[in-house]
Regions:
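Juxtamembrane "helix-exit" motif on the non-cytosolic side of transmembrane helices
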Residues: 24-26, 75-84, 143-155
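Non-cytosolic membrane-interface motifs at loop->transmembrane helix junctions
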Residues: 83-94, 154-164
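Membrane-helix boundary/juxtamembrane motif in polytopic membrane proteins
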Residues: 107-140, 180-187
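A generic, lipid-embedded transmembrane alpha helix
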Residues: 55, 62-79
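C-terminal transmembrane-bundle signature of multipass membrane proteins
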Residues: 43, 136-187
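N-terminal topogenic module of multi-pass integral membrane proteins
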Residues: 1-45
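Membrane-interface helix-boundary motifs at transmembrane edges
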Residues: 47-60, 83-84, 114-125, 185
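Membrane-interfacial loop-to-transmembrane alpha-helix junctions, especially the N-terminal start
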Residues: 5-12, 53-64, 127-131
Length: 187
């Protein structure tokens, strides 16, 4: 059994990891909140929580792959480039890996919530609801990116609408994780 401070820290790191994933602020072509930092925070969270649920440890290799991908993309941005869009098959593999990683991560957090939340709380259901929304949004982004050539007249509107939904969903995900970590502080 993991102590409450470790659980609090693990959930906090994941919540802040989502901050780095959802808030991509650029100076020119370079992100000042790079996504790979978010992945490193997830990996740190996984390390802290792996004794609590075996599935956390199983996410580690995929987290490393995504961290390397995001770091490579961030380094390419310093040269004005990007890793996305050059190999469609590789983009698809990364999209699927990203969806699976986040789906499983939130599934594991919901399972932890069932174990630690107070009777009558519904943190687990809240985490699962936002997990599902995030998965749908990531799938929609992946599909519309593949269909960009056919949506050219509407592309700006489609990406703007998806960005707004994605941002709202991300804020809700982070708020759910920050609410979940309170379980460990109050105990």
């Amino acid at each position: 059994m993991t102590d409450k401070n470790t659980l609090y820290s693990g959930v906090s790191r994941a919540a802040w990891g989502y901050f780095f994933l959802y808030f991509d602020i650029n100076l020119g072509t370079v992100s000042i909140l790079p996504s790979f930092i978010g992945m490193l925070l997830f990996l740190s969270s996984i390390k802290l929580l792996k004794d609590e649920r075996r599935d956390f440890a199983l996410l580690r290799p995929l987290g490393i792959l995504l961290a390397v991908w995001y770091a490579g993309d961030w380094l390419a941005s310093w040269l004005g480039g990007s890793l996305d869009g050059h190999l469609v098959f590789l983009d698809l593999i990364i999209s699927l890996a990203r969806m699976y990683f986040h789906f499983q991560l939130f599934t594991d957090f919901a399972a932890l919530a069932v174990k630690y939340q107070s009777p009558g709380d519904s943190l687990d259901k809240r985490l699962l609801r936002w997990r599902t929304l995030q998965t749908v949004i990531l799938a929609a982004v992946s599909l519309t990116t593949c269909m960009a050539q056919w949506l050219s007249a509407w592309w700006e509107y489609v990406t703007f609408a998806m960005a707004i939904i994605y941002l709202i969903g991300g804020l809700c995900l982070m708020m759910a994780l920050f609410a979940f970590r309170k379980v460990f502080r109050e105990s």
